[in-house]
Amino acid sequence: METGNVVNAQPELSGIIDRSKSYMYEQLWKLCAGPLCDIPKLGEKVYYFPQGNIELVEASTREELNELQPICDLPSKLQCRVIAIHLKVENNSDETYAKITLMPDTTQVVIPTQNENQFRPLVNSFTKVLTASDISANGVFSVPKKHAIECLPPLDMSQPLPAQELLAIDLHGNQWSFRHSYRGTPQRHLLTTGWNEFTTSKKLVKGDVIVFVRGETGELRVGIRRARHQQGNIPSSIVSIDCMRHGVIASAKHAFDNQCMFIVVYKPRSSQFIVSYDKFLDAVNNKFNVGSRFTMRFEGDDLSERRYFGTIIGVSNFSPHWKCSDWRSLEVQWDEFASFLRPNKVSPWEIEHLMPALNVPRSSFLKNKRLREVNEFGSSSSHLLPPILTQGQEIGQLSVASPMNISLLYRETTEDAMNPSRLLMSYPVQPMPKRNYNNQMVTQIEENITTKAGTNFRLFGVSLATPPVIKDPIEQIGSDISKLTEGKKFGQSQTLRSPTKIQSKQFSSTRTCTKVQMQGVTIGRAVDLSVLNGYDQLILELEKLFDLKGQLQTRNQWKIIFTGSDEDEMLVGDDPWPEFCNMVKRIYIQKRR
């Protein structure tokens, strides 16, 4: 590691949010803060919720909420203006936070505004979730080919071994040196010398995210975002100075009474307690009631945005100290399981209404992109397809389940009834409008059938002379649930199978297998990952396919790698099994050198 500044040919552009920092610093800070970070604008009118600030202090100091909150005459929300924003990073953990200066809204003070028309240079960036091999003792970081081409300085490919030195600055202003080379079999982009020092100094672990940003002038920035389980607290020095010296309530009360500025610390992963005035009004006007369906955004492990669905089951005050407060006033119930803890009470501005046509959510963990028939319910696949025009759908109009009927599936028929959101993983379909040319085509077909009696006409495999009877999937589900209820009354044991299991049984034979190539073997093999439960079974299956008998388990002679859509090589076993199944395109077995 080196400390210093990179010399640019042009003066560094100041940030738009934090003018004391550079534009590149600001872009890196936002990427490290995550996709859900919502920083207000300079001069913007906002609502400040003391309850949210106290909640952040509670999480940081592990104090009880009630012990921190005295009883005083302070509104549940304060209307303020944003005076200044300073984007910061914690020295030890590299966690991002912001110091936001607020002032109770007044027209007597000149408020600085954010320059939205400022020139914004082109910035390329990429993020990657670190695997076990990325932080291993060999000190090598594999850069996906697409990201290396777009975000790293170009290599001189005319050289026998293309390589270059990279200088990257982190959020602290420290400069790091990495050796970037293009080598291996097959060749790939690697960061070698300097990478091990970086991972050791930053105490990186598997699951952390590395962030690279490159500006138009070639300046390179590097940052990290800790995995969710690695998230620590705001440093005690910051909390004690900015929040705890006079107390959150005391400082807010003093500013409110005397119309003076006060500073709050905002952490990107905390709930938003500084809310835009317009955003707050939109949320309140949405009229969230008991029974309303909603969706809420969360951050995935790879810095991606994920949505989860739920239902509002109650409206009440989160704390007895503030009556009629909107902070976490909605009690919710989630539809699906998540690998992390989600709140059971949320604020109106954190969620979005689900439109009636979207009341049947697509499961966030349902990754299958190929839609399949579910004949278990006695319906054609057209009932379960999303609102996309399919072949043959223009001929006539199919009967589909209305959103009103589908929404009834969320009510449990009996105590032991399954959650129908899991029973029927389908998409709501709006009826296709009838068109004039549909009637003309059907009339033409009917005339042909009349003139040529005895001939069985088929259109897309469907007999036009004797149209099939299409059963309503909703009625069939109701019948199955009724049978289940009756069976339990008489002590019988009946089980409704979920469509996921039905699909896997019906279509396992048609799934695309993954090709496996072994060094020294001309003809490759194919393995079906859908029937395997993990890496141990995969290794056993590969040993059977190539008659290796235990040689792959020790990995002394062979190594197993795979390539994804970007053709980059990665070791098998570094990623969680479900992620591996989604990424893998081809598997290779190579001899160790």
Curated annotation (Swiss-Prot):
Compartments, as annotated in UniProt: Nucleus
Keywords: Auxin signaling pathway, DNA-binding, Nucleus, Transcription, Transcription regulation
DNA-binding region: 126-228
Pfam families: ARF_AD (PF06507), AUX_IAA (PF02309), B3 (PF02362)
Principal subcellular localization: nucleus
One GO CC term, this protein: nucleus
Boundaries of every PB1 domain copy: 511-592
Record-linked SMART domains: B3
GO BP terms: auxin-activated signaling pathway; regulation of DNA-templated transcription
Gene3D superfamilies, sorted: 2.30.30.1040, DNA-binding pseudobarrel domain (2.40.330.10), Phosphatidylinositol 3-kinase Catalytic Subunit, Chain A, domain 1 (3.10.20.90)
GO molecular function: DNA binding
InterPro entries assigned: ARF_dom, ARF_plant, AUX/IAA_dom, B3_DNA-bd, DNA-bd_pseudobarrel_sf, PB1-like
Functional summary from the UniProt entry: Auxin response factors (ARFs) are transcriptional factors that bind specifically to the DNA sequence 5'-TGTCTC-3' found in the auxin-responsive promoter elements (AuxREs). Could act as transcriptional activator or repressor. Formation of heterodimers with Aux/IAA proteins may alter their ability to modulate early auxin response genes expression.
Protein family per UniProt: Belongs to the ARF family.
Assembly notes: Homodimers and heterodimers.
Domains as described in the record: Interactions between auxin response factors (ARFs) and Aux/IAA proteins occur through their C-terminal dimerization domains III and IV.
Name the UniProt record assigns to this protein: Putative auxin response factor 15
Organism: Arabidopsis thaliana (Mouse-ear cress)
